[in-house]
């Protein structure tokens, strides 16, 4: 009998509720077939939360997130709230507060190319076919949070903008541990990325990751400067297995890697916190794509990135590799059969909507399970 686990669903804005509804169908199928015992609570976040509760993230929702075994988020934001709200009430602030209050410091951004979609990439098919890279980005430190920061007036009439790139040892070590552990479950290769040639924070990063590498003799550790890494991702992306890097470089490199795949509608992500004594981590999972308000409510959204985010949850929060593989292989199956939502549509393929993609995925899962 599977152990009961609590998941908090935060559908959010735009296409969020539609894509999350398809995840609920996948989860219900896993529950009904006796593979899992998930309990779901629903709450509001982003613009939907502001409209109903006057804040992009209510304290009660934070409490639910802290009590849950994992959080799954749809999407937040949209033009409805962009111009009218002060910065601290914008939908995206709800997401940032969630990450902060859950103490999520490691952002996992996989860049996978399914064989059926290899031609959608802007790179040559042979460069990206079979690509499976995982970028681990430090999420709560570095230049986005370092002090001092700000814009000040100078005596000569000019203005000065200051941001501070700063990392302490523990911030580097904890995210590097996540990356080493991931590499151990994948291809046993880890590339640490910084600018140790010109930045002291990068030099400290390299020294600490190298020291930690002694605890992981089975992992082949390499180091690369961030500018070279960006070039290599475009030149020969399949040389990488797991990449670990800081907040700024991770922000840039993960978006670079995302476009190797051809569609943001296919990309999941995870954000992880520290492990407790039992090895459990606070975690939030979400698709990389935005809320796409222009197609919301029209059954046009691609649910696969959110479904693949749920697959990451199965794998990394609940250690259910077999169930995660089932979901991943079902996604491969429906794509191989030529089913496409509008964002990944190609001539000669079959156009389906959000619900139609969900129908096909459930049928594929049932077929694979038998």
Swiss-Prot record:
Upper classification of the organism: Bacteria, Pseudomonadati, Pseudomonadota, Alphaproteobacteria, Rhodospirillales
Keywords: Amino-acid biosynthesis, Branched-chain amino acid biosynthesis, Cytoplasm, Leucine biosynthesis, Magnesium, Manganese, Metal-binding, NAD, Oxidoreductase
Gene Ontology molecular function: 3-isopropylmalate dehydrogenase activity; magnesium ion binding; NAD binding
Cofactor(s) listed in the protein's UniProt record: Mg(2+); Mn(2+)
Quaternary structure annotation from Swiss-Prot or TrEMBL: Homodimer.
Keyword Amino-acid biosynthesis belongs to the record: yes
Residues given in the record as NAD(+) binding sites: 290-302
Binding locations of substrate: 99, 109, 137, 227
Site label Important for catalysis, positions: 144, 195
PANTHER family in the record: 3-ISOPROPYLMALATE DEHYDROGENASE (PTHR42979:SF1)
Class in the EC hierarchy, top level: oxidoreductase
Protein name: 3-isopropylmalate dehydrogenase
GO biological process terms, semicolon-separated: L-leucine biosynthetic process
Gene name, Swiss-Prot/TrEMBL: leuB
């Amino acid at each position: 009998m599977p152990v009961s686990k609590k998941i908090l669903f935060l559908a959010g804005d735009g296409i969020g509720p539609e894509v999350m509804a398809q995840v609920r169908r996948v989860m219900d199928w896993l529950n009904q077939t006796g593979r899992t015992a998930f309990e779901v609570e629903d709450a509001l976040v982003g613009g939907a939360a502001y409209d109903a509760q006057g804040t992009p993230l209510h304290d009660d929702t934070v409490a639910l997130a802290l009590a849950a075994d994992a959080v799954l988020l749809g999407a937040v934001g949209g033009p409805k709230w962009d111009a009218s709200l002060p910065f601290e009430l914008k939908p995206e602030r709800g997401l940032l507060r969630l990450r902060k209050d859950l103490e999520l410091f490691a952002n996992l951004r996989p860049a996978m190319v399914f064989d059926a979609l290899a031609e959608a990439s802007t790179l040559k098919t042979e460069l990206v076919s079979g690509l499976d890279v995982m970028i681990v980005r430090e999420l709560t430190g570095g230049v986005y949070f370092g002090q001092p920061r700000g814009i000040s007036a100078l005596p000569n009439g000019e203005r000065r903008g200051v941001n501070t790139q700063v990392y302490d040892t523990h911030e580097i070590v904890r995210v590097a541990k996540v990356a080493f552990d991931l590499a151990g479950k994948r291809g046993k290769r880890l590339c640490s990325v910084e600018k140790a040639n010109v930045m002291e924070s990068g030099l400290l990063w390299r020294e600490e990751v190298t020291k930690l590498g002694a605890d992981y003799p089975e992992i082949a550790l390499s180091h690369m400067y961030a500018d070279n890494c960006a070039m290599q991702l475009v030149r020969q992306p399949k040389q990488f297995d797991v990449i670990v890097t800081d907040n700024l470089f991770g922000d840039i490199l993960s978006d670079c890697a995302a476009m190797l795949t051809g569609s943001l509608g296919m990309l999941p992500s995870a954000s992880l916190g520290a492990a407790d004594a039992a090895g459990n981590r606070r975690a939030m999972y979400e698709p990389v794509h935005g809320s796409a308000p222009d197609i919301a409510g029209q059954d046009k959204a691609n649910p696969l990135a959110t479904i693949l985010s749920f697959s990451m949850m199965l794998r990394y929060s609940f250690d259910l590799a077999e169930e995660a593989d089932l979901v991943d292989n079902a996604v491969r199956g429906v794509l191989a059969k030529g089913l496409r939502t509008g964002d990944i549509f190609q001539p000669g393929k079959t156009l389906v909507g959000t619900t139609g993609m969900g129908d096909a995925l459930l049928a594929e899962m049932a077929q694979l399970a038998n």
